[in-house]
Amino acid sequence: MINRNNRSVYFVWRFSEMKVWFAVSEAAPFAKTGGLADVAGSLPKALRKHGIDIRVVMPKYSQIPQQYINKMSFIGYTYVNLTWRREYYGIFTLEHEGVPFYFIDNERYFNRDWYYGQVDDGERFTFFCKSVLEVLPVIGFRPYIIHCNDWQTGLVSVLLDAHYRYYRNKGFYQYIHTVMTIHNLKYQGIFPKEMMDEIIGLGWEYFHPDGVEFYNCINFLKAGIAYSAKVTTVSRTYAEEIKTGFYGENLDGILRKRSRDLCGILNGIDYGENDPLTPNIYVPFSVNSIEDKQKNKVLLQKEAGLDVNPETPLIGIISRLVAQKGLDLIDRMIAELLEMDLQLIVLGAGEKRYEDMFLWAQGAFRGKMSANMRYDHVLAQRIYSGCDMFLMPSLFEPCGLGQLYAMRYGTVPIVRETGGLKDTVIPYNEYTGEGTGFTFANYNAHEMKDAVIRAMRVYKDKEKWRGIVTNCMQQDFSWERSAREYGNLYNQVCGITVTK
């Protein structure tokens, strides 16, 4: 240990000596509402392969499947102070695929109908953030890094500085640093300022424009951005975009201020869970047997109630049905698209107006449109493997996983150039044969339609199309590279020269 600029720093020379406490509000397969759960279920596995001692902590929701609850071991219990009130929390643990998971149990806060959207979410996740810190000496784990994710864990960094680093357990917390990952800047956890002393127990010296204050409210995500050692997002382009007014969701100012400590690390996908050679799809295939992909298409057309024709381009959409996903562009163009020689299959749920749009189209264009207003993991894999193209016209997309899954199964993405979509989809060049998809730059329905038309034109040339499908399947978006980047980031936070 040395002292650098009056700051004590532990040197961790190898990944194998690094210890990380990964705090998250959801993780697959225990609880999932979006891509955050996929990251939390996959990234720790990849980091442990590098020898990093990473452990995950999350709430013990009542919705966790019973098969996992039955395998959990009870460690013990203790209490958290929420100003004047003491709240019980139990500690359960379970090792899943080589990763230790710890679950914070409290019936008052986590036995609810759903994970989020409760009237007392601010209090619930204040409790969780305090538990993330309080539980460490109880389980005997002293990490170098606490890796926080999204607003639900945003208070950890400021609470660590305000109450724990120098004041608790005889220096136990003194050399712990925090990293904050923004998975989606739109969701920030904004609550009344009265929570400062009534629930959180923070002094008002933290309530200022460079701290937790946000238009006279408290902003949990901003707290994480302001007080963490490093801030990351899930793609390089998104890291640049959120420093602008258009994408910054009113936090662009503090993000520009923290720009030296802000970086983008692209998400990966679990190649074991998403493998076209597994029996989860109709007919397993690989980059060496692309012709078998056509068999998946025909069987998908039959299951989805579409006209069976292997020559008709089939476009898939798997998405939360919300405005962020560019569905208003599809709303403007869906009739024109379906009047073309193509088919469309949609899987997802969300806002009623978008569900109604797709259901209307299914009735108006029978045999050409299949609307499945739900989430179904098995059907999702069949769509990824059976479609020719995959449409993602997002208004903004921090990383996006759909296009990565699609390319894994040889389905060519059609995307808007934003966030992770821009970083992962290489525009197709008809002259060189390079590229992995079709893109458009502006948020415009006619540009989206033009990208679809360009894709359909190339689709008619079977040799060119096989080339672009091969390009897609040869891409590597596994977690290996991302895990090494995170490992290097952890070392940077601890003051270590980054390995190449």
Question: What do these predicted regions represent?
Answer:
Residues 4-7:
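N-terminal cationic leader/targeting segments used for protein routing and processing
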Residues 9-500:
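Catalytic cores of nucleotide-sugar-dependent glycosyltransferases that transfer UDP/GDP/TDP-activated
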